[in-house]
Swiss-Prot record:
Originating organism: Macaca fascicularis (Crab-eating macaque)
Disulfide bond annotation, renumbered to this chain: C44-C105, C159-C165, C288-C343, C394-C402, C638-C860, C806-C834, C882-C1046, C909-C918, C1010-C1016
Gene: CATSPERG
Region (Disordered): 1138-1159
UniProt topological domain (Cytoplasmic) ranges: 1088-1159
Statement: the UniProt record of this protein carries the keyword Heme: no
Biological processes annotated in GO: cell differentiation; spermatogenesis
Residues glycosylated per entry: N102, N177, N355, N426, N574
Main location: membrane
Protein name (record): Cation channel sperm-associated auxiliary subunit gamma
One of the Pfam families matching this protein, by short name: CATSPERG_C
Quaternary assembly: Component of the CatSper complex or CatSpermasome composed of the core pore-forming members CATSPER1, CATSPER2, CATSPER3 and CATSPER4 as well as auxiliary members CATSPERB, CATSPERG, CATSPERD, CATSPERE, CATSPERZ, SCLO6C1, TMEM249, TMEM262 and EFCAB9. HSPA1 may be an additional auxiliary complex member. The core complex members CATSPER1, CATSPER2, CATSPER3 and CATSPER4 form a heterotetrameric channel.
Length: 1159
């Protein structure tokens, strides 16, 4: 639409002079009230952009988020930190981007403001929330946040000032595997200028790449930088379809005769116009008649990793490059055409993922009329299946010709809701709602839509029973939509039908039958926005029956008058709405503005509360004469004046939100500004903190239940020393890392509002209270005969549960007469009947709780500095099942203590492993387990029942083997007759089929057997010590524990030493040992007996050798002089005498003989 599009069109409103004056007066009053608010709270806002690692400090730098690989440039800096509590031998990496944070106020220079804020102590606090992934089979389901404090950094631009000219704050932009959607909330630390909190979408764009010139470009097509007015002015708005909270990149088509789309990774804070690189071919045939060809991209759907488009009858998809989700080679190189032989008339989105996958539906015409092509997307891989699998919908509902107009998929129920148009032999057409179950291929006709629109006779709504009267206007359905939380179904066209059970429908008469709904957008938090074919906008609160027109309306006229008076850049007299969509619980418009022949595409908030309030004020007022003048007064239809939530419990136990806190390291510079090195160190610390979180899934529980405990375990005692170094400016690297600045937060306080979601385990309760300050004369007294008076209030609260058979709510009213108020205490409780058991965070049942103050819907508002806020209607999604963040862990600490107590001793392995202590085979093994809550920090003994199975093992860690089902049965079942049992217990309780023992924390313990056919039987020792064995143990409470919805499964290794040998091997070793021992004894005895003889023989041989030597010496020197001869003769005689003496005394030692020979 074009021209004065956003002004009221249609019948001319009565222009009574008094009414014009009153409207003008109302505008002035509201404007002045707004101006007062501005004066009290200066309108300032946060500004956030991305900067690459190497572009920190550059003015005007802004980068796109597509790099996903960690950078290895910070490790060298950590090697410099020798006197710091960190371990420089660990691996520290950095992220490719920083968040650059500034703020601006109206009519003030941003650089001056930031500098002033820094000098007054202002520091931005950044909360990064990672969206959990779709495929929970690959990634862990968790709700993770990290809270960082931004570090001040001087600009690198030249500056003549001594200290600083321009500056900004920076924090690392962390990346987490499995998450491509990131929410950044920026708030103030409470010092300096008041700046309201602001939320930014900072998502990874997997459809960008660098070309050969190092420029960034789109992979899906070519980016256009000139947004021509003819692309947007006067076009019809289109719905924005995507997987809720999971799509990092949104895509919007609908530009006439061009294959252009708008793409954004910031929820249209920034956007790009892209010409898609598709072939734009047109294939017409006898089964796919086409009256003409157009390049327009009609339908667009965005999922976590893949984009879908429809052009004419052709469907294409493109998978982005997301290395944080799957392998790099999964990304598409070009658009892929699917369902090439089909004639596709429409794409239908599926807003919620399920079973680790996302879905999309393609409605066909021609040869496969009556079938739906059901697409499944997982890890970037796309597959389609035609449903129903055998007979078409037409054949199963008993008509010859039918057409599926719309389809909606209820993921949790595996059910397709089909809106079917049937044509009968008399050429009449009727519409039905058909349900098809994809799991069992069941099709059921749910509801026949009436042929004509009912006659409401002045009522707001009408229950369709078949007995009411009808108008002459034919019902023309166009779509069907279901909210999986409250199960509320809408059928829409030139009417609006509502149902909560798929059987009984209510006609909402406030929506005029002269209009036709083009599309609906739902917040899935209780609000619905409707766009008609004439671009009117209507609004509905789910569970109520009043439909409000937002545009055109009296409220809109007042609102736009105020905006134009304030010269807002978000409004113009000539504007065109491109789409209407919800972001969280807020409604936004994407609007093209024309001002002075210049076009601008903006995203703006649709002020629903303001419009309803203005509309109420302009429609209900009184003129009372007070003396000589008239006084204007407004009627307040709200049943209460003040509404507050009280007694709210800590949110983390129910929202399952994990949060870490990380502050930047302290820099040893008097100005307090960081440098590139300190920011890089901050990057490395954030990376290591997230790495500790990711690896904190060990089967053996730490003595302290906290992922950061091991980081500072060995340095806590030196904390004062590190502080001493920092206080004396002697810390290495110029930074001081404070250990207490990196921690996990377990005690978040409630924000005085209901949580974003509630997770309920078996029998869990959630309690809170609503305080309502009533209007005057809101109490009455009631008394029966013989009873005391009781106070009753006109203010009532109703609680609507989507699944009353699964959850229950109780409301207790307390009248506070002295405060003219009522306190309603509400308790929501799980009834323990609607869920079996599931893995933590998997296959949760969706439900909801809606709290409504009777008579308040659309009538009660609260004024805040951020604008009006609707009150009286609260809707909270409820997830029933095993909450995320719970796990089972082996309590090794208590197991060792209890085993030492019961067995009177404890013997560890010879080679001690502190990460895996050993247990002695002959001792009774008493295992204990912990239920650890990663969100709240609670860690307590598992009190439920479980089954323990040995599912693998080996004598060494390198020879571990997983057992098959038959082996697991033989090694663990008390019914085994093959002598293969590994262990046994005196516990008598078993599973229903008696196959396995059921144990608990009170069980008498495990006795190791290792019978002759068990794998641990007859192991060969690896050394002189007894054999060892590693058992792979599985512990599960599946089917045996009724205390929780959680299906806990824990697999861990158990090191057993001191295993006995088999009798044969023991006898063999005994015989060998005895043989060796006997041989050694015999050898010793023989040695002792033969040794003297050996000594004697050796002595005789030596004597003879000496005698021979002496004789040879005599004859050799016979010719020498007389004295020499005499001396020789003397020696010879003495030798003879010595020989005679030896004959007489043979006991003389060998040493004496030698001395005699030398004499």
């Amino acid at each position: 639409m074009c021209g004065p599009a956003m002004f009221p069109a249609g019948p001319r409103w009565p222009r009574v002079r008094v009414l014009q004056v009153l409207w003008a007066l109302l505008a002035v009053l509201l404007a002045s009230r707004r101006l007062w608010a501005i004066k009290d709270f200066e309108e300032c806002t946060w500004q956030v952009v991305l900067n690459e690692f190497k572009r920190v400090g550059e003015n005007g730098a802004s980068d796109r988020f597509f790099e996903q690989e960690l950078v290895d440039t910070v490790g060298n800096l950590f090697h410099m930190l020798v006197d710091s509590p960190i371990d420089p031998r660990e691996k520290y990496l950095g992220f490719p981007y920083y968040l650059k944070i500034n703020y601006s106020c109206e009519e003030k220079h941003s650089e001056d403001l930031v500098r002033m804020g820094h000098l007054t102590g202002l520091k931005p606090v950044v909360l990064v929330t990672f969206q959990s992934p779709v495929n929970f089979y690959r990634w862990k389901i968790e709700q993770l946040q990290i809270q960082m404090e931004a570090a001040p950094f001087r600009s690198k631009e030249p500056c003549i000032a001594e200290e600083v000219c321009s500056m900004s704050w920076y924090t690392p932009m962390p990346i987490k595997n499995g998450s491509v959607v990131t929410r950044v909330d920026v708030s103030s630390n409470g010092l300096g200028t008041f700046i309201p909190d602001k939320r930014f979408q900072v998502n990874i764009n997997g459809f960008l790449k660098r070309n050969q010139d190092n420029d960034i470009q789109f992979t899906v097509g070519d980016e256009l930088f000139n947004l021509m007015p003819q692309y947007f002015v006067g076009i019809s708005s289109r719905p924005l379809w995507h997987t809720v909270d999971q799509s990092p990149v949104l895509i919007l088509g609908g530009i006439p005769n061009e294959k252009y789309v708008l793409m954004t990774d910031t929820s249209f804070k920034d956007f790009s116009l892209v010409e898609l690189s598709i072939d734009s071919c047109w294939v017409g045939s006898f089964y796919c008649p086409q009256s003409g060809f157009t390049a327009t991209i009609y339908d667009t759907v965005a999922t976590e990793s893949t984009l879908f488009i429809r052009q004419n009858q052709l469907v294409y998809y493109f998978t982005g490059t997301y290395t944080t989700l799957y392998e790099r080679n999964r990304g598409s190189g070009s658009w892929v055409r699917v369902l090439a032989s089909e004639c596709i008339k429409k794409l239908c989105p599926v807003y919620f993922h399920s079973n680790g996958s996302e879905y999309i539906m393609a409605l066909t015409t021609g040869k496969h009329e009556g079938f739906v092509h059901f697409g499944t997307i997982r890890d970037g891989q796309v597959s389609f299946e035609m449903l129903p699998r055998e007979w078409s919908v037409c054949e199963q509902i008993g008509v010859t010709t039918c057409s599926i107009i719309w389809s909606d998929y209820i993921a949790g129920e595996y059910t397709l809701l089909l809106l079917v148009e049937s044509e009968y032999e008399n050429a009449s057409k009727r519409f039905q709602v058909v349900s098809y179950n994809t799991a069992n291929d069941d099709l059921e006709l749910l509801y026949h839509i009436p042929e004509f629109i009912p006659e409401a006779r002045g009522l707001e709504f009408l229950m369709i029973l078949g007995t009411e009267s009808y108008t002459n206007t034919v019902m023309t359905p166009k779509g069907i939509s279901c909210n999986p939380y409250n199960h509320l179904i809408f059928i829409w066209g030139n009417f609006l039908l509502q149902s909560s059970n798929k059987e009984n429908f209510i006609y909402l008469a406030d929506f005029p039958k002269e209009l036709s709904i083009k599309y609906m957008t739902r917040s899935f938090r209780g609000a619905v926005a409707i766009v008609t074919e004439t671009e009117e906008i209507w609004y509905l609160l789910e569970g109520t029956y009043r439909v409000y027109r937002l545009f055109p309306s009296k409220g809109w006229k007042v609102h736009i008058s105020l905006q134009l008076m304030q010269q807002s850049s978000l409004y113009a007299s000539n504007e065109t709405m491109l789409t209407l969509f919800y972001e969280g619980s807020k409604l936004y418009q994407l609007v093209y503005l024309m001002n002075n022949q210049k076009g601008q595409l903006v995203k703006r908030l649709m002020p629903v509360e303001q419009l309803l309030m203005y509309q109420q004020h302009t429609s209900h007022y009184d003129l009372d004469r007070k003396g000589g003048y008239l006084m204007l007064s407004f009627t307040n239809f709200c049943p209460f004046s003040v509404m507050r939530l009280r007694n709210l419990p800590g949110p983390q136990r129910y929202t399952r939100q994990e949060r870490y806190r990380a502050r930047p390291p302290h820099v040893l510079e008097r100005s307090g500004f960081h440098n590139e090195n300190s920011l890089a160190i901050y990057q490395g610390l954030i990376y290591y903190l997230l790495w500790l979180h990711s690896v904190y899934d060990k089967p053996y529980a730490d003595p302290v239940h906290d992922p950061t405990w091991r980081w500072w375990e060995n340095n806590k005692q030196d904390q004062d020393y590190y502080f001493f170094l920092a206080s004396n400016w002697r810390s290495a690297g110029g930074v001081f890392i404070e250990m207490d600045s990196y921690e996990k937060i377990y005690n978040l306080k409630s924000a005085y509002e209901l949580p974003e979601r509630i997770f309920l385990d078996k029998g869990t309760e959630y309690s809170f209270a609503i305080f309502l300050s009533a209007q005057s004369r809101s109490f009455r007294t009631m008394a029966d005969l013989g009873t005391v008076f009781e106070l009753h209030s006109h203010v009532d609260v109703g609680v609507v549960l989507a699944d009353p058979g699964c959850i229950e709510a109780s409301v207790k009213q307390e009248v506070l007469i002295n405060r003219n108020a009522v306190l309603f205490s509400i308790t929501l409780k799980d009834k323990k009947v609607c869920y079996d058991q599931g893995i933590s965070g998997h296959h949760l049942m969706k439900s909801s709780m809606t709290v409504n103050v009777v008579g308040s819907s659309g009538l009660c508002f609260q004024e805040t500095h951020a604008g009006a806020r609707m009150q009286g209607n609260l809707m909270v999604p409820v997830f029933i099942g095993c909450p995320p963040g719970k796990r089972l862990a082996f309590d090794i600490t208590y197991t060792l203590e209890y085993s030492r107590l019961k067995n009177k001793h404890y013997f560890d392995c010879v080679q001690v492993d502190p990460e895996m202590p050993c247990f002695l085979f002959r001792d009774i093994f008493y295992p204990f387990f912990l239920i650890q809550d990663l969100v709240t920090g609670d860690s307590g003994s598992f009190q439920g029942s479980y089954v323990l199975l040995v599912v693998g093992g080996g004598p060494t860690l390198d020879t571990l083997k997983d057992y098959n089902k038959d082996e697991i049965y033989r090694f663990n079942s008390p019914l085994d007759k093959t002598h293969s049992l590994i262990w046994t217990t005196r516990t008598k309780r078993t599973t229903k089929d008696s196959a396995f023992h059921i144990m608990s924390h009170e069980s008498p313990g495990i006795e190791w057997l290792c019978l002759e056919n068990a794998p641990c039987y007859d192991n060969v020792p690896q050394g002189i010590f007894a054999p060892e064995f590693f058992f792979k143990v599985l512990v599960s409470n599946r089917g045996v524990d009724t205390s929780t919805y959680c299906n806990y499964q824990l697999t861990f290794l158990l090191h057993i030493h001191g295993l006995p040998l088999s009798p044969k091997r023991a006898l063999f070793i005994l015989m060998v040992s005895l043989s060796v021992f006997v041989g050694l004894v015999i050898f010793y005895i023989a040695f002792c007996l033969l040794w003297p003889l050996v000594v004697k023989g050796c002595t005789m041989i030596r004597w003879k050798i000496n005698d021979i030597i002496a004789s040879e010496s005599y004859y050799t020197y016979a010719s020498i002089s007389g004295m020499s001869s005499m001396q020789s003769l003397r020696r010879s005689r003495m030798g003879s005498m010595f020989s005679s003496r030896m004959t007489e005394d043979k006991a003389e030692p060998k040493e004496a003989v030698e001395r005699q020979l030398m004499t």
